[in-house]
Swiss-Prot record:
Active-site residues per Swiss-Prot or TrEMBL entry: D289
Functional pathway: Cofactor biosynthesis; ubiquinone biosynthesis [regulation]
Organism lineage: Bacteria, Pseudomonadati, Pseudomonadota, Gammaproteobacteria, Lysobacterales
UniProt GO molecular function: ATP binding; protein kinase activity
GO BP of this protein: regulation of ubiquinone biosynthetic process; ubiquinone biosynthetic process
Transmembrane segments: 506-526, 535-555
Name this polypeptide is given: Probable protein kinase UbiB
Entry-linked InterPro entries: ABC1_dom, Kinase-like_dom_sf, UbiB, UbiB_bact, UbiB_kinase
Record's bilayer topology term: Multi-pass membrane protein
Keyword set, alphabetical order: ATP-binding, Cell inner membrane, Cell membrane, Kinase, Membrane, Nucleotide-binding, Transferase, Transmembrane, Transmembrane helix, Ubiquinone biosynthesis
List of residues binding ATP: L127, A128, S129, A130, S131, I132, A133, Q134, V135, K154
């Protein structure tokens, strides 16, 4: 019943913000059309706004979980129009804080200790509050030297898992409905989007996992002058409570404060770009939620001329496969050299495009995207925008991208935005190119090859004795003509599934029609038995069942 009420509320919000066009061609649109006369419409001021703005306002009204849904959806620029994605990036994950005493109880349950024992002090007034968790200031008990260390404690909201499970279940139902009925479902891939959102939210609900992310990132950047990562206090961390060293800094978008502190913004902007490319191509572990609120600048006066970033919030991290890492770096270098042929070849070699695509057509498409950028000033060129437009154009040729690559696009866009805000004349290409060239040199260096070989040596030694037997067996099969090839085609499986669904619909429709005929025959025969009005009860039952079957067949179109 709760799910029905929740779905009803979502429908009312969709109608009020005039978003029913988003569901065009689906059964949901037909039901909404019936409800439209009974739902008050939005004001003329809201109606005049763009579809992206209306969607953003609707998500904000539906609550924090849908705000998070919108934020994640904004990263899927391969699935939604650019104007909608841009508007969804404005969603703010700020909600009313929950009671500080409730936070104390959650921390005590998570750590298995009273707060008064675990901490010397715990401020019940939160420093910040979001849809998943909120953050409290605290101090640890005195150490051996009598020092009370300042920390922050991130605490999950009470019953947040139950709320998310209910909303995700509803989103899964809506996604299944859209996939079955929407004419562009193969392009939107709604179930894939909801599954990605579910995975992202599940990761953010495990604060111990977030602590592990922070710990790994800190290890990569230990002692760096470019990036600082707060230390995780593992003795005070659990699944529902995360304790980190407290850090002080200036948000990277607060230009007035940065200037007042005498920070060298030009040096800082270049460092931001280098840090990102190093995370992606050296460490293969990048901060994937790098907006200005999560990227601070160290406020230490001694670091004015050699500024350092501080990373916060480690719930969403990204990693690429070795192949994607290499092909992405090669793609960037091909862009630098205006080698459109190589860009087209790399898209196919990486497996992002089907092997039967015409390289010359893809080359022409890449040229049409990149050439307009090369005629702009260097300070206006965006690698993120080039990459996004390349992938969008490539969708015409059945582009297949892993979610991590899409996450990287969004992160690169954020990093470039932060860099350009700090230094509007930042030449991102000049900063990124040396990093990429070094990465590619190292990839082919003899030292790296030997290192990779030494890692695989135990595996090679394990399988080496079996190789002669396997080769002999394969050659014997070739000579005797016994070699068989097993073909597994996702397209054939999808076709089989579509045919099964069609068969089910046809059978349901035939059954429904038959029951209606039975109802009419019974009515004409006037059989003995019970009547409801002038119609036999069995006619009512048969007619009702037939109508229900036809309705089900219609909804499954």
């Amino acid at each position: 019943m709760k799910a029905i009420l929740r779905a009803s509320r979502i429908g009312r919000v969709i109608l009020r913000y005039r978003l029913d066009a988003l569901l065009e061609g689906t059964p949901a649109e037909r039901w909404l059309r019936l409800a439209k006369p009974f739902v008050p419409r939005a004001s003329a001021e809201i109606a005049a706004q763009s579809r992206g703005a209306r969607l953003r306002l609707a998500l904000q009204e539906l609550g924090p979980i849908f705000v998070k849904f919108g934020q994640i959806l904004s990263t899927r620029r391969d699935l939604i129009p650019a104007d909608v994605a841009e508007e969804l990036t404005l969603l703010q994950d700020r909600v009313k804080p929950f009671d500080g005493q409730a936070a104390r109880l959650i921390v005590e349950a998570a750590l298995g200790l009273p707060v008064s024992v675990a901490f010397a002090s715990f401020d019940t007034v939160p420093l910040a509050s979001a849809s998943i968790a909120q953050v409290h200031a605290a101090t640890l008990p005195p150490d051996a030297n009598g020092v009370r260390r300042e920390v922050v404690v991130k605490v999950l909201r009470p019953e947040i898992e139950r709320q998310i499970d209910a909303d995700i279940a509803l989103l899964h139902s809506l996604a299944t409905l859209v996939e079955r009925t929407h004419p562009r479902a193969d392009k939107i891939r709604p179930r894939e989007v909801v599954a990605e959102i579910e995975g992202t939210l599940a990761a953010e609900l495990d604060l111990q996992r977030e602590g592990a992310n922070a710990s790994v990132l800190r290890r990569f950047w230990e002692g760096s002058d470019d990036l600082y990562v707060p230390e995780v206090i593992w003795s005070h961390t659990a699944e529902r409570a995360l304790t980190l060293e407290r850090v002080y800094g200036i948000p990277s978008d607060d230009i007035a404060k940065l200037d007042a502190a005498g920070i060298d913004r030009k040096a800082l902007a270049a460092k931001g770009v280098r840090v990102f490319y190093t995370q992606v191509f050296r460490d293969n572990f990048f901060h994937a939620d790098a907006h200005a609120g999560n990227i601070w600048v160290d406020s230490d006066p001694e670091r004015r001329l050699n500024p350092r970033f501080i990373a916060l919030d480690f719930g969403i991290m990204g990693q690429l496969s070795q192949e994607d890492q290499y092909y992405l770096a090669e793609n960037f270098m091909a862009i630098f050299h205006k080698d459109y042929r190589r860009m087209a070849e790399l898209h196919v070699e990486a497996g992002w495009m089907p092997s039967n695509v015409r390289i010359d057509e893809l080359e022409a498409a890449a040229r049409s995207v990149c050439e307009p950028y090369f005629n702009r000033p260097l300070s206006e060129i965006s690698l993120a925008q080039v990459l996004i437009k390349l992938f969008r154009v490539a969708q015409r040729y059945e582009l297949t991208l892993q979610p991590q690559l899409i996450l990287l696009q969004k992160t690169l866009l954020n990093i470039e935005g932060v860099g350009r805000q700090l230094d509007p004349r930042l030449d991102i290409w000049a900063v990124a190119r040396p990093v990429l060239e070094r990465i590619l040199r190292e990839r082919y260096s003899p030292r790296r090859v030997l290192r990779e070989l030494s890692k695989r040596l135990p595996e090679i030694m394990t399988h080496a004795p079996d190789m002669p037997r396997l080769v002999y067996s394969w050659l014997t099969q070739q000579v005797e003509g016994r070699h068989q090839i097993a073909i597994r085609s996702p397209e054939l499986l999808a076709l089989d599934l579509s045919l099964r669904k069609l068969q089910t619909r046809v059978v349901t429709a035939i059954t429904g029609s038959g029951l209606l005929v039975v109802a009419a025959v019974l009515y004409g025969l006037h059989p003995d038995g019970w009547y409801l009005g002038t119609v036999p009860v069995w006619s009512w039952i048969s007619g009702g069942a037939g109508s229900a079957a036809l309705l089900v067949a219609w909804l499954r179109r």
